[in-house]
A protein has these predicted regions:
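A short, Lys/Arg-rich alpha-helix, primarily the initiator
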Residues: 1-16
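Residues that mark the N-terminal boundary/hinge immediately upstream of a DNA-recognition element
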Residues: 6-9, 20, 46-49
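Short alpha-helical DNA-recognition segment
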Residues: 18-37
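The alpha-helix within a helix-turn-helix
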Residues: 14, 25, 54
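DNA major-groove recognition helix of helix-turn-helix/homeodomain DNA-binding modules
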Residues: 48-64
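Short, conserved catalytic or interaction motifs in soluble domains
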Residues: 40, 65
Length: 65
């Protein structure tokens, strides 16, 4: 997946759960600006950040070869 696709999946999961960007940022311990950038695929983040966001939304990360 590209960073854009990951961001889109995060945004869709967040919206499906009725979580605002502000609430998501609070839950994940990051800024609203960072959440917006990740969701738009504009922000290169490490796997630890993706993991934190996924855990916040009860998502699973899957690595494929």
């Amino acid at each position: 997946m590209t960073k854009e696709q990951i961001g889109q999946a995060i945004a869709e999961a967040r919206k499906a759960q009725g979580i605002t960007i502000r609430k998501m940022a609070e839950m994940a311990g990051t800024s609203t600006r960072a959440i917006q950038a990740v969701e738009k695929g504009l922000y290169n983040v490490g796997i630890d950040t993706y993991l934190k966001l996924a855990q916040t939304l009860n998502m699973r990360l899957k690595f494929e070869n």
